[in-house]
Amino acid sequence: MRFRMLLVYQDGQATTSTFNLRNTAMMVFNSASTQKRITYGEVLDIDSGEVIAEVHRAYQFKQNTYHR
């Protein structure tokens, strides 16, 4: 079995990594998905096509408000 991890960052960049072991894929994903700059991530079981882990993060960008 092989597993593919996809991470999408705030700036639109994305990275993928492939792992042969589920435990390794999940360990790396759990560590990476805690980064605040990750907006989306998933671990996909390549053989079955099943997404076994997923994270979505919505960001609100602060707007500067100037008072006179």
Residue locations for each model-derived region?
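Surface-exposed loop/edge segments in extracytoplasmic proteins
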Residues: 12-18, 49-54
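Generic structural motif
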Residues: 8-10, 22, 46, 58
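Short aromatic-glycine-(Arg/Gly/Cys) micro-motifs in beta-strand/loop hairpins
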Residues: 1-15
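Charged, amphipathic alpha-helical segments
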Residues: 20-31
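Short, mixed-charge low-complexity intrinsically disordered segments
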Residues: 34-68
